[in-house]
Curated annotation (Swiss-Prot):
InterPro entries: AA-Vitamin_Transporters (IPR050638), EamA_dom (IPR000620)
The keyword Nucleotide-binding appears for this protein: no
Subcellular location, record wording: Cell membrane
Annotated family: Belongs to the EamA transporter family.
TM stretches of this protein: 6-26, 33-53, 70-90, 97-117, 123-143, 155-175, 185-205, 219-239, 244-264, 265-285
Topology of the protein relative to the lipid bilayer: Multi-pass membrane protein
EamA domain location: 12-141, 166-292
Organism, scientific name: Clostridium kluyveri (strain ATCC 8527 / DSM 555 / NBRC 12016 / NCIMB 10680 / K1)
GO CC aspect terms: plasma membrane
The protein, known as: Uncharacterized transporter CKL_3017
């Protein structure tokens, strides 16, 4: 169990630096957001490849055209759209704001799960959605937007972050259908490659740079994002699930809003406005309510399974 909590801490640290690393690249201004995600996920996919190949052999998986189409859809949603939108978000707004808003993906997952997976929505879940959305509105600060204070860049960045969160939640729900069949390494490795291919096509068609713009100043950040955030971070997350449980491991996403904000202040020197702090608190409370509900349901399921096994 102690090993599991170490995995949770490492995952939280790696995942909390996603937007900060992206912001560092955005500040240098030499690379296109789509280009950044193509390179980063290509690195991550290559690192996960040996483990994916091993799992395919062990599980004797035979991927059909239907499987590849499904994995391609997941890759396009997660890599080509969601993560690219998140990179655009940090180009326009603060890394801390983008990180916190992206963490609301758990809230948007609930309605998608209801319509796609036919999962029931409990009253406490609705409460968590409302509390989290209040946090989003506070961060938006409608009064400030109406007055035109602070310019439009922040608002554009916030919109990109919310699009990233919504698309990621859709990806999360769709991935639930088959991820257990393939296993985490196979699922992510292949979907990463499909996402990279889609981005490569986009870059070529639109005449955007593919590898130009990479310098000694930004290559280390790209390598860090690809190796530690996309590959090692996910390996640690799977380790956390294995050593604890899926529900316990999900505390990573309770830690991220606060940790990402602190790291953005320390590393990027960002200043955080009062409304953002209040919004973060609401989003964390909403996440805690949702986590507590899931944990209770998981505990009841374990008790039910134990009782049926004993009888």
């Amino acid at each position: 169990m102690k090993k599991g909590y170490i995995f949770i801490l490492l995952t939280a640290i790696f995942y909390s630096t996603q937007e900060i690393s992206g912001k560092m690249l955005a500040q240098k201004g030499a690379m296109d957001p789509f280009q950044v995600m193509m390179i980063v996920f290509l690195i991550g996919a290559i690192i996960l490849l040996p483990m994916a190949v091993k799992d395919i052999k062990v599980k004797k998986l035979k991927l059909t055209g239907n499987d590849l189409g499904y994995l391609a859809l997941c890759g396009i949603l997660a890599v080509s759209i969601s993560m690219s939108m998140l990179q655009f978000a940090v180009t326009y707004t603060k890394a801390s704001t983008a990180a916190v808003l992206f963490c609301t993906n758990a809230v948007f997952t609930i309605p998608f799960a209801y319509f796609i997976l036919k999962e029931k929505i409990k009253g406490i879940t609705i409460v968590s959605i409302i509390v989290s959305l209040i946090g989003v509105v506070i961060i938006f600060n409608p009064a400030k937007v109406m007055e035109g204070i602070g310019g439009s860049r922040d608002l554009i960045g916030i919109c990109f972050a919310l699009v990233a969160a919504v698309v990621w939640s859709l990806y999360t729900v769709i991935s639930k259908k088959r991820i257990e069949i393939y296993g985490g390494y196979v699922f992510n490795c292949i979907s990463f490659f499909f996402g990279v291919i889609a981005l490569l096509i986009l870059l070529v068609v639109t005449g955007r740079p593919i590898f130009s713009g990479i310098t000694l100043n930004n290559i280390l950040v790209l390598l860090y994002m690809g190796i530690f955030i996309k590959a090692v971070g996910y390996i640690c997350y799977l380790g956390a699930i294995k050593e604890t449980s899926a529900v316990t491991a999900s505390t990573v996403f309770l830690i991220k809003p606060a940790l990402a904000t602190v790291l953005a202040i320390l590393i990027l020197g960002e200043s955080i406005e009062v409304n953002v702090v209040i919004g973060i608190v609401f989003i964390i409370i909403g996440s805690i309510i949702n986590y507590s509900s899931n944990k209770k349901a998981n505990d009841l399921k374990k008790v039910a399974n134990t009782s049926s096994a004993e009888s």
